Curated annotation (Swiss-Prot):
Residues 37-41, 92-113, 174-196, 244-306 are cytoplasmic. Keywords: G-protein coupled receptor, Membrane, Receptor, Transducer, Transmembrane, Transmembrane helix. Residues 279-306 are annotated as: Disordered. It is a multi-pass membrane protein. This is Latrophilin receptor-like protein A. It is found in: Membrane. It comes from Dictyostelium discoideum. Belongs to the G-protein coupled receptor 2 family. LN-TM7 subfamily. The gene is lrlA. GO terms for molecular function: G protein-coupled receptor activity. Its main location: membrane. The keyword Membrane applies. InterPro entries: GCR1-cAMP_receptor, GPCR_2-like_7TM, GPCR_2_secretin-like, GPCR_GCR1_put, GPCR_LN-TM7. The keyword ATP-binding does not apply.
Length: 306
């Protein structure tokens, strides 16, 4: 397949998948902001993760459209920042799950301030260093870090730390689930379900990091380069959509939306019935008045006739 045609197909595919992911992340944020009763503390962390996904994908798309423009460098900085924030929020979500299952910490919300410091603060420090040494450039098709060393220390190394940390966390959590919850089937099923969701999110984001890193160090015009570019585009673009399916397509969310639409529908029909009733009442009144007027006119005519 000609490279030009492949680039065109990949561009359209990426745009579609990016749109799905952004819409999925936005709907997840919207749903849990709309219904506070569904917004548990772990869900709050998922909302922050979705925010980082929305911004990272948005500026990722902008970076490909900002080549040879004044917005190229700012787009490169923002892409780098929000992708790093994306990685660090997966760590925060995983560590919070570790606190609940392994440590059985009832005050896990105490750590939220530290999650924010880690997930927003460390990426900020990294991009400050990269920007200070002018490592963001236009790479001829998109805007990102200048060379392999910048990618290695500014993107790969933080990713390695996060991926290794998350692997250790999920190993401990899996062992704890197997060891302590085997005698409580109901609770086990729910916890295993949560574990699968969290682990799937980690795999999705971790795989995009791996594919993106390999693509950065491969020949972009080779078959291997194209393969990893496609894998990176797909895995990156479906993160938000996967989270939406995992957290919003369930009975509780459907029940809340159904209740809201039912209440809105009942309220709408009540207003319509009241309006229809007022119209019906005004009809007979108008007829009576008209009849009275006609009677009065007839009487007056008869008097003058007499």
């Amino acid at each position: 397949m000609p490279s030009q045609l492949l680039n065109t197909v990949l561009s359209y595919l990426t745009d579609i998948l990016l749109s799905l992911s952004i819409v999925g992340s936005f709907l997840t944020i919207f749903t849990f902001m709309l219904y506070p009763k569904l917004r548990s503390y772990p869900i709050k962390l998922i909302i922050y993760l979705c925010m980082s996904i929305v911004f990272s994908l948005f500026f990722f798309e902008i970076s490909f459209r900002s080549s040879n423009s004044l917005f190229c460098i700012p787009a490169a900085i923002l892409v780098h920042y929000f992708f790093l924030a994306n990685f660090f929020w997966t760590f925060s979500v995983s560590f919070n799950f570790f606190q609940m299952i392994v440590k059985r910490n009832r005050d896990s919300e105490f750590y939220e301030r530290y999650y924010h410091l880690i997930s927003w603060g460390i990426p900020f420090i990294i991009i400050i260093f990269c920007a200070a040494f002018k490592k963001y450039v236009d790479r001829g098709g998109f805007c990102y870090l200048e060379d392999q060393y910048s990618v290695y220390f500014g993107f790969f190394m933080p990713g390695v730390i996060i991926v290794c940390s998350n692997i250790c966390i999920y190993v401990f959590v899996a062992k704890e689930i197997y060891k302590t919850l085997r005698h409580t089937p109901t609770q086990k099923r729910q916890t295993v379900k949560e574990f699968r969701v969290y682990f799937s999110i980690f795999v999705s984001i971790g795989s995009s990091w791996i594919f993106g890193f390999i693509y950065m160090f491969s020949d972009s015009n080779s078959i291997i380069g194209y393969i990893f570019l496609i894998l990176f585009s797909i895995s990156t673009s479906l993160q938000g959509f996967f989270i939406f399916i995992s957290y919003c397509l369930n009975y509780k969310v459907f029940a809340h939306y159904s209740r809201s639409f039912t209440q809105y529908g009942v309220s709408f029909f009540k207003r319509w019935e009241n309006l229809d009733g007022e119209t019906t009442q005004s009809g007979p009144t108008g007829t009576t008045d008209s009849s009275s007027t006609m009677t009065s006119t007839t009487t007056t005519t008869n008097v003058y006739s007499a």
